[in-house]
């Protein structure tokens, strides 16, 4: 895979832009991770809003800087609110990110997420099994967990990006972020990231926040992945286990600088 690209220098500046000009991120996310997602966005300098009522979703999506759709605890009522928010985001030109949690494992959410693909998501962030399933390919998933390696899903991610116009981030031991042509690869992270509920979902929220700050969604999605990986590595050095890791992860997200990212992933 000689065509893999490093983290772009322009992307490294985006976390500082988020802190200087906090984007308002409208999160239609699942009830398990809502608080942690909000805290991750706050740590990164963004402004989270967890507006989920169908009656408010459209109005809020129009005023937001970015919209996140996460189907982790999807219900028919929530799906209706998501449809309204996505339609309003498209009308307003607001970037929106799809997190297809457990797609492929359950029929209702799989059908719903495939429906949303026609609404031109700016970015899609998922694990290998989710990306494979969303692309219509066989995957080995167990609920929200993936038994596939991210390398296996890269070709599917590229095809999904080509078909939808979205940037696709397939995350694992190595994260691959692609717009169908360009591919950025980021190795790293720490196993403790899989021991705390909500790290993947909050990463998708970071993708939404970062893509709101740039005309190049590939750079936005890539720096979000880099931020979570490096914060995870640093938090693990200080943590005694999953509980303290979650706290340190927030601290490290808040503390990371462009220089830290450039040192970890030199161009």
Curated annotation (Swiss-Prot):
Pfam families: HK. It comes from the Bacteria. InterPro entries: Hyethyz_kinase, Ribokinase-like. Pathway: Cofactor biosynthesis; thiamine diphosphate biosynthesis; 4-methyl-5-(2-phosphoethyl)-thiazole from 5-(2-hydroxyethyl)-4-methylthiazole: step 1/1. Substrate binds at residues 50, 198. Its EC number is 2.7.1.50. It is an enzyme of class 2 (transferase). Its cofactor is Mg(2+). ATP binds at residues 125, 171. One of its GO terms (molecular function) is magnesium ion binding. It catalyses: 5-(2-hydroxyethyl)-4-methylthiazole + ATP = 4-methyl-5-(2-phosphooxyethyl)-thiazole + ADP + H(+). One of its GO terms (biological process) is thiamine biosynthetic process. Keywords: ATP-binding, Kinase, Magnesium, Metal-binding, Nucleotide-binding, Thiamine biosynthesis, Transferase. SUPFAM superfamilies: Ribokinase-like (SSF53613). NCBIfam families: PRK09355.1, thiM. Catalyzes the phosphorylation of the hydroxyl group of 4-methyl-5-beta-hydroxyethylthiazole (THZ). Belongs to the Thz kinase family. This is Hydroxyethylthiazole kinase.
């Amino acid at each position: 895979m000689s065509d893999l690209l490093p983290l772009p220098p322009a992307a490294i500046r985006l976390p500082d832009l988020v802190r200087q000009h906090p984007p308002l991120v409208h999160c239609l996310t699942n009830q398990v991770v809502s608080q942690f997602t909000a805290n991750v966005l706050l740590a990164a300098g963004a402004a989270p809003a967890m507006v989920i009522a169908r009656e408010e979703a459209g109005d809020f999506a129009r005023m937001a800087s970015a919209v996140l759709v996460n189907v982790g605890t999807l219900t028919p009522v929530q799906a209706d609110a998501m449809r309204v928010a996505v339609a309003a985001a498209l009308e307003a030109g607001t970037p929106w990110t799809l997190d297809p949690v457990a797609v492929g494992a359950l029929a209702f959410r799989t059908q719903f997420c495939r429906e949303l693909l026609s609404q031109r998501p700016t970015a899609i962030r998922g694990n290998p099994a989710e990306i494979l399933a969303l692309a219509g390919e066989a995957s080995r998933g167990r609920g929200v967990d993936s038994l596939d390696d991210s390398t296996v899903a890269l070709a599917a991610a590229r095809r999904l990006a080509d078909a939808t116009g979205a940037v696709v981030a397939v995350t694992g031991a190595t994260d691959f972020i692609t717009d169908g042509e360009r591919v950025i690869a980021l190795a790293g992270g720490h196993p403790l990231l899989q021991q705390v509920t909500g790290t993947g979902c909050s990463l998708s929220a970071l993708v939404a926040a970062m893509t709101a700050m740039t005309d190049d969604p590939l750079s936005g999605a890539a720096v979000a992945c880099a931020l979570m990986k490096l914060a995870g590595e640093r938090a693990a050095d200080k943590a005694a286990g999953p509980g303290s890791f979650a706290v340190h992860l927030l601290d490290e997200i808040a503390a990371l600088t462009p220089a830290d990212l450039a040192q970890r992933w030199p161009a």
